[in-house]
């Protein structure tokens, strides 16, 4: 026979208390992107994480992009490259575009290819009765924002005020770490290490297994670090 109170809880419609986990639905650890005060002050809640990092001059991924990501080309480089001119053996990067093909109505052979600039094309197409830019047919405002930000960051070398502030903060933290005094071993810790060495010598795994001399169950790596420091202080 089960417990009556537990059965009532199972039948109840009241929501059960769930312990907050430090992991996301995908199983990865949750990261507080606003943990840094400088980033929190310059964060735009209307943009996604990738767009915010791009705007601030930061990288969302440390690894190189893989699959489905095309290397961007700055607007200045595109203006200097002609689709009809080649410079030696260097391969020119040609951006994909559209053109009209004029065919013979009888044979179907291609007579000529009309480029958009030759046909007086203004770079727009008609979508659902509305004229849209050929590069942005869905009229997505974030697409325009991303293009502008990408070209700006590439031209300026991704150097922003936020990056400079973060670099100064990191340099100050590094100086504080250098000024910290190293931890000195106490007299009791030195006596404890001396007893371990007198009994086991260099056999650190045996020191770990000793319940009397190692009541706090210090790990093998921890004891090795303490011994290394202890031997260094004796010299």
Swiss-Prot record:
Enumerate the residue ranges of region (Disordered): 1-28, 120-189, 211-235
Tell me the subunit arrangement.
Answer: Component of the pre-66S ribosomal particle.
| Extent of Basic residues compositional bias | 225-235
What's the chief localization of this chain? nucleus
The protein in question is named Nucleolar protein 16
Nucleus found in the keyword field: yes
Please describe what this protein does.
Involved in the biogenesis of the 60S ribosomal subunit.
Localization in the cell: Nucleus, Nucleolus
Stored Pfam families = Nop16
Tell me which domain of life the UniProt entry assigns to the organism this sequence originates from.
Answer: Eukaryota
Q: Which InterPro entries match?
A: Ribosome_biogenesis_Nop16
Of the GO CC terms on this record, one is:
nucleolus
This protein's UniProt keywords = Nucleus, Ribonucleoprotein, Ribosome biogenesis, rRNA processing
Which family does the record claim for this protein? Belongs to the NOP16 family.
Can you supply a Gene Ontology BP term from the record?
rRNA processing
Annotated signal sequence is none
């Amino acid at each position: 026979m089960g417990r009556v109170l537990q059965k009532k809880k199972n039948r109840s419609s009241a929501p059960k208390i769930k312990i907050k986990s430090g992991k996301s639905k995908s199983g990865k650890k949750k990261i507080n992107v606003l943990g840094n005060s400088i980033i929190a002050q310059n964060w735009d809640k209307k943009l996604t994480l990738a767009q915010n990092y791009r705007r601030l001059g930061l990288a969302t991924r440390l690894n190189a992009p893989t699959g489905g990501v095309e290397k961007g080309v700055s607007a200045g480089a595109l203006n200097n490259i002609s689709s009809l001119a080649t410079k030696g053996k260097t391969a020119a990067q040609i951006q994909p575009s559209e053109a009209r093909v004029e065919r013979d109505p009888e044979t179907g052979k291609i007579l000529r290819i009309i480029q958009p600039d030759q046909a007086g094309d203004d770079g727009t197409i008609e979508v659902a009765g509305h004229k849209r830019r050929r590069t942005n047919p869905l009229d997505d405002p974030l697409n325009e924002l991303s293009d502008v930000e990408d070209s700006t960051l590439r031209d300026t070398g991704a150097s922003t005020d936020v990056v400079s502030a973060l670099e100064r903060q990191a340099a100050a933290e590094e100086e504080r770490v250098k000024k910290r005094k190293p931890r000195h071993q106490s007299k009791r810790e030195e006596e404890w290490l001396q007893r371990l060495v007198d009994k086991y010598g260099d056999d650190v795994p045996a020191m770990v297994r000793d319940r009397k001399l190692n009541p706090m169950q210090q790990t093998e790596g921890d004891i090795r670090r303490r011994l290394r420091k202890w031997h260094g202080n004796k010299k």
